[in-house]
Amino acid sequence: MKNVDIFKESEEYMPGGVNSPVRAFKGVNLNPPIIKSGKGVIIKDEEDNEYIDFVLAWGPLILGHCDDDVVEAIKEVSSMALAFGAPTKLELDLAKFICTNLDNVEMIRMVNSGTEATMSAVKLARGYTKRKRIVKFAGCYHGHFDGFLIEAGSGVMTGGIPGSLGVPNESIENTLIGIYNDKEQITELFKKYGNEIAGVIIEPVAGNMGVIKSENDFMETLRDLCNQYGSLLIFDEVMSGFRVAFKGAQSLFNVKPDLVTYAKIMGGGLPCGAYGGRKEIMKNLSPLGGVYQAGTMSGNPIVMAAGIATLNKLKNNQNYYDHIENIGARLEEGIINISKKYDLPVVMNRVGGMMTLFFNDLKEVRTYDDVKKCDVNRFNRYFEHMLKSGFNLPPSQFEALFLSVQHKESHIDAFLKAFEEFALNENKMSL
């Protein structure tokens, strides 16, 4: 069957033909290719078209598709176990690995997704502090938990909606909105509500309004305010954890969070999530404390095995991060040079192996308001050109592009060649 026929039939059985909205390509006005296989950085659709992949399952596949060691670990465990709903040594192994290798995580609780991790961390913060209010930042996405679906970045921006139907005002009345990288605004917010704020949740490297790194003095301000008012600082490292550095985005700042959430890379490509922090806080979770959270598939042995294989490989090959940094810099520099050559207004934001090309004529993109000024129509033309040229990119101006250890200079150079063709066409259109 052709891709378009499969997608058309999918629309009869799944809302929008997909199980997560951005996959429908609605924002770029195209039909998505239907992917059937992947190895390394090459994925293949049902018509046997091949694409160089810069989405990598939205970030988890830092080792590339079907890494041999990860697949072998999955095979080995799946021959003995699928699920128990009981303690296993594998979950201890992964928990111990994370707690001994990361700075600020003394205890950890496994869950099944990034959304579960963030919503559970917020519940824990509320239970620990006995307060209700949570601060999130405009443009940051922390999953589809009701309390977060306000000013939530890519998912709702791409769909052209401010939030989500089905979320009553009561669900968000205790959510306060901060402005990313704005010290003065967050300080004023704390002056007004500080003694009611249970916690502040932030992507230290935002990825769902495009890639924007928190500024050092802004992060220090958050830490100081949380200390002053007795609130918890929660880092959402679902996307940045183990990606921008082995120890994640928190290693890029001289700031310690109280709680951290993980997913994506830590599951090796399988459904996974976790949240952790100081023992003093984590011991408030049931069965030790009064904050209840549970899950049938939490700590699933196959997922734990995939996570252990992935994280061990990253720890034992720290040069992987050097490689990703080098090819990322090559891609960034190439895009900037080509854009200047053809008078194409762009801003490139990159932190390690995650980056966003903003079609924006500002000098820098550092806030959600800056992101809103992007030329979405130009992005859509760029996306279509690159897809036809054999590149799988995020189908949204407001998402991150990802690199893996399997990307080579030849893949980057091929990308830049296709991008230059696009830039030339845009230049001709403007004449």
Curated annotation (Swiss-Prot):
InterPro entries: 4pyrrol_synth_GluAld_NH2Trfase, Aminotrans_3, Aminotrans_3_PPA_site, PyrdxlP-dep_Trfase, PyrdxlP-dep_Trfase_major, PyrdxlP-dep_Trfase_small. Transmembrane segments: none annotated. GO terms for cellular component: cytoplasm. It is found in: Cytoplasm. One of its GO terms (biological process) is protoporphyrinogen IX biosynthetic process. The keyword Cytoplasm applies. It catalyses: (S)-4-amino-5-oxopentanoate = 5-aminolevulinate. Its cofactor is pyridoxal 5'-phosphate. The modification N6-(pyridoxal phosphate)lysine is found at K264. Its EC number is 5.4.3.8. The keyword Isomerase applies. SUPFAM superfamilies: PLP-dependent transferases. It comes from the Bacteria. Keywords: Cytoplasm, Isomerase, Porphyrin biosynthesis, Pyridoxal phosphate. Its main location: cytoplasm. CDD domains: OAT_like (cd00610). Pathway: Porphyrin-containing compound metabolism; protoporphyrin-IX biosynthesis; 5-aminolevulinate from L-glutamyl-tRNA(Glu): step 2/2. GO terms for molecular function: glutamate-1-semialdehyde 2,1-aminomutase activity; pyridoxal phosphate binding; transaminase activity. Belongs to the class-III pyridoxal-phosphate-dependent aminotransferase family. HemL subfamily. Homodimer. This is Glutamate-1-semialdehyde 2,1-aminomutase. The gene is hemL.
